[in-house]
Each structure stands twice: as structure tokens, then as C-alpha cells.
């Protein structure tokens, strides 16, 4: 009987606790901008002109709550100032990477001379610097190799920013890169699509959405489609960070940081506005105003060195004629803390304040914390180096193959190794200081290995160990030989 009651209770609970599955829910989220629009916005931030930023945000919808998109109440306008931090970040990152790039050399003397001529004529390292900045700002780009006997007898290397190219993929592999070149003829805009694929280059001219003959404008009259060996493509993409938003495209370092840059500009603009509003004001009774010694007229105030506000002279019997100066109190510490917080959010995950020359004593309390923050610069630098180390050998190889194809010579693979010098960061200096201590419980070989790791080859490290031992007076003696054969004969 008792078991039947228990079973009945269980059945009642089961029916009571039935859980219905949730109905499928669909969400629709609209992107604010496409890739080209986002690239344009990032370019304006990089240019760093407050007038251009103000115009840009007046045209972007749903940005009324942002600092640059807001419109002040009439009579309460504030001067919007831009710190220029985005441009400083990009230029600094590009500089600390490319300044350590070692020269590319080949074992073949003829190739070495040819590459030096190509580098000199194309100003290649300047182009690489510009390309790196554009890839950081826009997200990606591509190098294009072409030939024009009227300009040069060598390959012409050009870089196109990400907003001027399309990258087409086939099963996760790059199929072709389309370069967009704009021409304006008789106030009409034409766009040339140069499609660079494996073994071919094709040209199409568009006016709006309509395809036009190539002879429609003089700039494209002599262009013809070409085919060559299908083993290579005369275009090489340059992507530093992969985009999570646009599949197959690069990601700008500004993506996800625009709101932080906007807040930093707001903090700085408010601070400057408070300083301007907090100027000392001098109130002078009319009877004490400075006058011309000849005419007796009141001298007109000078905005540079003689500013004052005129007040009526007191008429009471015991009036005290005096000049009053008032200085409003500006909460400087509050503005500093706001500015530091906004600055920290802007640099987070990108670069260390000390790399930019910013005094971060108010951000970091000790040297150890500063060295840890400096590692952020190393992570970003290593990501840029990795992308250059992947792109540059491909570009050099394709350049030589394209040149041989143009000369109707057989093509061959060209392999190079891209190397960079060491970045003198506080972390490395701390390692040197620690390992140079003679009381460190490590052998010389272990210290050299810990200090240089994979950045130096085994031969270099063995030679370094030998030099250190010689300098410290450590002598390595050969193992004494024992003439066992003579001893056995005796």
C-alpha cells in the first residue's frame, strides 16, 4: 500500500515538472558600416584632424550620444579637441618594427644586385613602411606587381590599401585579388578592376554599374588581358590581424577602440574648457580704471596683458575702492584621473605608455609593473613581425618570377629568410641585469641560452660562451692523454 502511494506521488510530480522546450528565436542585427565605410572612418581617425572628425560624425547615424557626434546646446558650445593618439600609436608600432628589419641578401650575386636595383627604384622600404601603417589602420592591403616599359625596365611594385581591393577565396584559399583604380575624365568617374589571379591578369572598366570598353578613356586603352604560369599570382596580400567581423579580411587596431578614443578626446576637451573658464577675472571700479594721461579717457583693455571687468563705483559714504581678482578652483586631480583611465583603455592590448614616451608613474607604481606593461608592446610587435616574415618572402619570390616571365625566361623558386634585430625593452634589460650577476646559480652556457633563446643560432651562442669565459678568466684545458699502450708493453 505504501509503495503504491509513493508511486502515485512520483507520477504526479513527473507530470507537474514537465519542461517545454524553448521556441526558436531569430535576431536581426544591422551593421553600421561595411568594410569600406569602416576603413574610411579609421583613416579619418588616423589623419587626426578635429575638423574632419566633426564632419564625419555629423554624417554617421545613431552617434548623437558620442562626444564627436553630439551637438552642444546653443550658447554652451565647447571646443572639441583631438589628442592625436591613434596616429602616434600606428607610427610608433611601425617604427619599432621596421627599424630593426635586416637587409635581404641572396647567395646569388646577380639576384642580389637585381633586388637592390628593384628596391632602390621602387623605394621599397618606404612603401613597406606605408603599407604597414595602412594595414594597421585599415586592416589589410595588397602588393601588386606590374610592368611598364615607358616607366621602368624593372618590376613595378605598388601597394593598395584595403578599401581599394577585394580578396576572393575558394575553399579558404585566396583565388584572386581585385584592385580598384579610379579615374576621372571629363567629370565622369571610371573605376578599373584589375583582377590578379594565379596565371592571369584581367581588366574591366566600369562607369557606375555599367561595364565600358577599355578604350573609353586614354589611361586604359593599351591594357590587354594576359596569362602566364599558373603556379603563382602577381599580387600578395598583407594582413596583420584577422578580422572577426569580415571573413577573410584584416582587422584594424582601431576596431573596438573608437569609443575609447572618443572618451579620451572628451576628457581632454573638458579639461581644456575648464582651464579656459577658470581664468582669473579682475573686477575694477570705474573710478580706478587706467586712463590716458593726456585725454583722460579710459584705456581700452588689452586681451594679452591687461584684461579686466569694469564695475560701478560704490556711492556709500564709507565705500572701499579696491580691485578684486577671483580665481575659480579647478578640480585638476579629478580631470587627471579621468584622463589616465581613458588613456589606459585606449592603449590596453596595443602598446605600453612608456613606448610612446608617456610618463606612466601615475599608472604603474613600480618598475616590475612597468616591465609587465611593456610586454604588451612586444606582443603587438611580434604579431607585425610574424605577418611581415610571411608576406615578404612571398613578395620577393613572386617579383623574381614575374620578372623572368616578362623576359620569357624559365621561372624558379627564390627562398629568403627575413630577420629582425632585438627590441631593447625593459624586460630584456632586467634579464641582462639578473643574469650578469656572478652569484646567479647558473652556468655560463645556461645564461646565454636563457638570454638569447632562439634569436641566435647555436654557433653564435657557442662563440659568445667562449668570449665570456675568456673575459672572466675561465680557461678550458684539453683532457690529458694517457699512453695506455706503452703502459701495457711495460
Regions picked out by a protein language model, each given a short descriptive name:
Residues 1-159, 164-168, 172, 488-490:
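Extended, helix-rich architectural segments
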Residues 130-132, 147, 276-284, 356-362, ...:
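Short coil/turn segments at secondary-structure boundaries
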Residues 130-132, 136-138, 142-251:
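Extended, regular secondary-structure scaffolds
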Amino acid at each position: 500500500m505504501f509503495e503504491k502511494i509513493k508511486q502515485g506521488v512520483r507520477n504526479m510530480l513527473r507530470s507537474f515538472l514537465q519542461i517545454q522546450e524553448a521556441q526558436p528565436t531569430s535576431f536581426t542585427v544591422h551593421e553600421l558600416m561595411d568594410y569600406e565605410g569602416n576603413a574610411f572612418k579609421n583613416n579619418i581617425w588616423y589623419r587626426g584632424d578635429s575638423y574632419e572628425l566633426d564632419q564625419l560624425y555629423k554624417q554617421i547615424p545613431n552617434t548623437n550620444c558620442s562626444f564627436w557626434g553630439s551637438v552642444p546646446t546653443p550658447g554652451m558650445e565647447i571646443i572639441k579637441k583631438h589628442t592625436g593618439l591613434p596616429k602616434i600609436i600606428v607610427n610608433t608600432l611601425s617604427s619599432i618594427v621596421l627599424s630593426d628589419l635586416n637587409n635581404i641578401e641572396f647567395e646569388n650575386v646577380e639576384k642580389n644586385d637585381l633586388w637592390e636595383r628593384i628596391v632602390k627604384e621602387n623605394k621599397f622600404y618606404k612603401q613597406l613602411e606605408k603599407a604597414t601603417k595602412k594595414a594597421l589602420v585599415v586592416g589589410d592591403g595588397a602588393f601588386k606587381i606590374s610592368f611598364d616599359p615607358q616607366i621602368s625596365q624593372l618590376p613595378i611594385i605598388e601597394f593598395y590599401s584595403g578599401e581599394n581591393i577585394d580578396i576572393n577565396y575558394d575553399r579558404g584559399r585566396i583565388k584572386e585579388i581585385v584592385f580598384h583604380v579610379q579615374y576621372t575624365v571629363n567629370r565622369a568617374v571610371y573605376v578599373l578592376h584589375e583582377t590578379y589571379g594565379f596565371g592571369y591578369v584581367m581588366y574591366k572598366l566600369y562607369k557606375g554599374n555599367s561595364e565600358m570598353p577599355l578604350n573609353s578613356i586614354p589611361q586604359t586603352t593599351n591594357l590587354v588581358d594576359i596569362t602566364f604560369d599558373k603556379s603563382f599570382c602577381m599580387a600578395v596580400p598583407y594582413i596583420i590581424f584577422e578580422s572577426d567581423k569580415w571573413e577573410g579580411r584584416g582587422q584594424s587596431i582601431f576596431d573596438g577602440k573608437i569609443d575609447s578614443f572618443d572618451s579620451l578626446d572628451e576628457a581632454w576637451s573638458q579639461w581644456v574648457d575648464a582651464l579656459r573658464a577658470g581664468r582669473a577675472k579682475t573686477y575694477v571700479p570705474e573710478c580706478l580704471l587706467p586712463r590716458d594721461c593726456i585725454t583722460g579717457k579710459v584705456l581700452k583693455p588689452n586681451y594679452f596683458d591687461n584684461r579686466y571687468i569694469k564695475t560701478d563705483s560704490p556711492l556709500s559714504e564709507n565705500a572701499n575702492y579696491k580691485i578684486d581678482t577671483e580665481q575659480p578652483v579647478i578640480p585638476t586631480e579629478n580631470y587627471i584621473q579621468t584622463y589616465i583611465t581613458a588613456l589606459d583603455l585606449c592603449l590596453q592590448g596595443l602598446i605600453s605608455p612608456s613606448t610612446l614616451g608617456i610618463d606612466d608613474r601615475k599608472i604603474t607604481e613600480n618598475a616590475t609593473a612597468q616591465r609587465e606593461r611593456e610586454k604588451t608592446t612586444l606582443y603587438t610587435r611580434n604579431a607585425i613581425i610574424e605577418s611581415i616574415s610571411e608576406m615578404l618572402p612571398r613578395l620577393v619570390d613572386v617579383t623574381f618570377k614575374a620578372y623572368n616571365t616578362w623576359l620569357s625566361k624559365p621561372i624558379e623558386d627564390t627562398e629568403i629568410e627575413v630577420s629582425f634585430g632585438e627590441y631593447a625593452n625593459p624586460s630584456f634589460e632586467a634579464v641582462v641585469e639578473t643574469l650578469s650577476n656572478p652569484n646567479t646559480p647558473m652556468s655560463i652556457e645556461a645564461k646565454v641560452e636563457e638570454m638569447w633563446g632562439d634569436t641566435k643560432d647555436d654557433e653564435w651562442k657557442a662563440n659568445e660562451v667562449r668570449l665570456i669565459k675568456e673575459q672572466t678568466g675561465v680557461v678550458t684545458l684539453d683532457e690529458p692523454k694517457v699512453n695506455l699502450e706503452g703502459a701495457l708493453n711495460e
